């Protein structure tokens, strides 16, 4: 009786495997230093490769015991043991977990129907088409288990078939076929209720969302995940769904990325965990290949679609932060910065605060943010740099860029500068370069930039007036609000030159406001006078209302005339102070200790406080509010307060 006809048992002794058939072994097969002492007939009758090797060895080797070594056998010794059992007639359980590895081994040994009816390759392909390709869970498990033999599986058509099947299931409504309903471990009644032992429990199955498959494909290796995403792209799956799968995969394997992303609710987590219990053993650390996080980040970046979105921009900023932590290649960082810059108006301050992980002394990576801002500015001038939205609100093409994104980014940059201004190691040139990265038209008001500079001056009291003036020169004082001007005029952290310029432009604002108020009052009075008197009750009420308005406007007009007169008086006092200071400057110009002159934005000169003396200027204007301007013996805070008062129209 041949060994195949007997019920064969395999046992191991050390590093050798033996088959109990009652006959002595006449062939030794070595796989990964493991020896299998077997018999020629069952192996040669099923394996075309071994049959050919045996025929070649008979002409050269006359020994009764034949030894052969199988190099790079797919799946190793454990997989060859399964094939050997099949050759000896033992029943082999083909599952979705060992399907790919057995197929690779059968192809390696050429186990076709030519060497036996219903050979191993035929059985594997039958199981694939009848059971695996129709079931989501089996497809995912088969793909995941193919990682150890992926190099050999590349030559087969099984991997593309599995990926096409998975992509088709993702494109299709899962409730139509029941796959993924069966993966929850429960059955459904025709009405949708969950069945337990055939009994209707009354509980309803939670409907699966569009992201139900994210968790399952996250168990795949990086290479398989990349190939699957590309296959899904060819199937026409929406870019939003693919981006969501990639974001989910990256958060799972990149350290710290999940902390900076929005959390997932418990309900969505339970909805996504379709086959997590079935994959628990297969996805253990021992079975998962070692993950190269830098390669993963670069792979994710290469797969991400060229789209824009609020959560997508947040994810890109998280990737950039992780890239700095891992120390990835500079080209990868540049690509991330450029893609973030093209949608910077969708970012938030929290995501933009990227810590400095290099040897720099600054706490935050200000250079990176500046590069992102410059990418944003350059993208506005190029129509080809405009990224499409994931879900555009309308189908109308955008013909011209809206000024709103520029304003949003300006507010974001000003808030960022106010946040990083407290860093004592932040140099003035960094602040100046970041503030100047945006064009002047981006800021309708400079209040945010003024606030950032004020915080910076407070945390850096050792700065010289020259450094402060260089920073303040970026601001347009005409675009400061009344409140900001009022604060700046009392701010003892600002240089004297800046304070006087702010006071000058504040006066211009007030004069413009007064002129506008007078024009409005005159217009309303003219309209009120021309209203004809009527005899109906409604017209009488309207006439009385206009009479009241006229009286109020007349009172307002008188008050404004008084204010205008007061402004004239202040201007005369201002000119007298200016002439007096010119005389003092001409007298002291010949001395070696002559005071340094400060050129004002409003075209007049003031001596430094350190060179001023209490002389005739104080006496000449002591009875006016301007007298405090020449009182150089007061501290800086008092001087600034007096400057503010001197330009007040109501003091």
Curated annotation (Swiss-Prot):
Chain intervals with Basic residues compositional bias: 637-651
Pfam families: BTB, NPH3
Record domain BTB: where: 25-96
Keywords tagged on the record: Ubl conjugation pathway
NPH3 domain sequence ranges: 211-509
Gene3D superfamilies named among the record's database cross-references: Potassium Channel Kv1.1, Chain A (3.30.710.10)
GO biological process assignments: protein ubiquitination
Cytoplasm found in the keyword field: no
The organism's place on the tree of life at top rank: Eukaryota
Cross-referenced SMART domains: BTB (SM00225)
Pathway: Protein modification; protein ubiquitination
Location of the region described as Disordered in the Swiss-Prot/TrEMBL record: 611-651
Keyword hit for Transmembrane helix: no
Biased composition (Polar residues): 615-627
Domain commentary: The BTB/POZ domain mediates the interaction with some component of ubiquitin ligase complexes.
Protein family membership: Belongs to the NPH3 family.
Role this protein plays: May act as a substrate-specific adapter of an E3 ubiquitin-protein ligase complex (CUL3-RBX1-BTB) which mediates the ubiquitination and subsequent proteasomal degradation of target proteins.
Name of the protein: BTB/POZ domain-containing protein At3g44820
Species of provenance: Arabidopsis thaliana
Classification lineage: Eukaryota, Viridiplantae, Streptophyta, Embryophyta, Tracheophyta
């Amino acid at each position: 009786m041949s060994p195949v006809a007997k019920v064969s048992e395999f046992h191991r002794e050390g590093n050798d495997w033996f088959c109990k058939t009652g006959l002595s072994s006449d062939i030794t097969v070595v796989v990964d230093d493991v020896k299998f002492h077997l018999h020629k007939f069952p192996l040669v009758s099923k394996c075309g490769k071994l049959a050919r090797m045996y025929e070649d060895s008979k002409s050269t080797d006359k020994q009764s015991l034949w030894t052969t070594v199988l190099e790079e056998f797919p799946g190793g010794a454990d997989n060859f043991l399964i094939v050997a059992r099949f050759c000896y007639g033992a029943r082999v359980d083909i599952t979705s977990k060992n399907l790919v590895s057995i197929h690779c081994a059968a192809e390696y040994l050429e186990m076709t129907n030519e060497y036996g009816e219903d050979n191993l390759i035929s059985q594997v392909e039958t199981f694939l088409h009848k059971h695996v390709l129709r079931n989501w869970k089996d497809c995912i498990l088969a793909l995941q288990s193919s990682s150890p033999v992926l190099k050999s599986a590349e030559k087969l058509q099984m991997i593309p078939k599995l990926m096409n099947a998975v992509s088709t299931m993702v494109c299709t409504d899962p409730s139509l076929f029941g796959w993924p309903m069966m993966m929850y471990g429960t059955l459904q009644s025709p009405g949708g209720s969950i069945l337990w032992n055939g009994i209707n429990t009354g509980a309803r199955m939670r409907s699966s969302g569009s992201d139900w498959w994210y968790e399952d494909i996250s168990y795949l290796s990086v290479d398989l995940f990349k190939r699957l995403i590309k296959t899904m792209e060819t199937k026409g799956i929406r870019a939003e769904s693919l981006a969501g799968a990639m974001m989910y995969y990256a958060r799972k394997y990149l350290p710290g990325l999940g902390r900076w992303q929005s959390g997932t609710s418990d309900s969505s987590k339970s909805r996504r965990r379709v086959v997590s219990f079935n994959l628990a053993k297969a996805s253990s650390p021992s079975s998962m290949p070692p993950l190269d996080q830098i390669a993963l980040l670069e792979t994710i970046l290469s797969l991400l679609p060229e789209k824009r979105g609020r959560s997508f921009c947040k994810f890109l900023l998280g990737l950039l932060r992780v890239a700095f932590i891992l120390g990835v290649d500079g080209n990868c960082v540049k690509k991330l910065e450029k893609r973030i810059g093209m949608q910077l108006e969708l970012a938030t301050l929290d995501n933009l605060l990227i810590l400095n992980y290099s040897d720099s002394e600054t706490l935050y990576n200000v250079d990176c943010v500046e590069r992102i801002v410059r990418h944003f500015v350059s993208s506005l001038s190029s129509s080809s740099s405009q990224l499409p939205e994931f879900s555009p609100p309308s189908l109308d093409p955008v013909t011209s860029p809206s000024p709103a994104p520029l304003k949003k980014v300006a507010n974001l940059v000003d808030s960022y500068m106010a946040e990083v201004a407290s860093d004592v190691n932040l140099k003035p040139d960094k602040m100046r370069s970041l503030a100047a990265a945006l064009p002047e038209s981006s800021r309708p008001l400079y209040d945010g930039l003024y606030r950032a500079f004020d915080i910076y001056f407070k945390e850096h009291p050792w700065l010289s007036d020259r450094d402060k003036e260089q920073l303040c020169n970026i601001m347009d004082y005409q675009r400061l609000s009344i409140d900001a001007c009022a604060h700046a005029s009392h701010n003892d952290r600002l240089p004297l030159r800046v304070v006087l310029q702010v006071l000058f432009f504040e006066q211009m604002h007030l004069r413009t406001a007064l002129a506008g108020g007078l024009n409005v009052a005159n217009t309303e009075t003219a309209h009120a006078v021309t209203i004809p008197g009527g005899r109906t009750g409604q017209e009488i009420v309207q006439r009385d209302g206009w009479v009241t308005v006229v009286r109020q406007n007349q009172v307002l007009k008188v008050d404004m005339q008084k204010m205008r007169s007061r402004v004239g008086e202040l201007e005369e006092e201002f000119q007298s102070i200016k002439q007096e200071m010119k005389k003092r400057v001409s007298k002291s110009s010949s001395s070696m200790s002559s005071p340094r002159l400060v050129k004002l934005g409003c075209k007049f000169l003031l001596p430094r406080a350190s060179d001023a003396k209490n002389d005739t200027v104080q006496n000449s204007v002591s009875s006016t509010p301007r007298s405090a301007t020449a009182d150089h013996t007061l501290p800086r805070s008092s001087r600034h307060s007096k400057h503010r008062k001197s330009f007040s129209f109501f003091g």
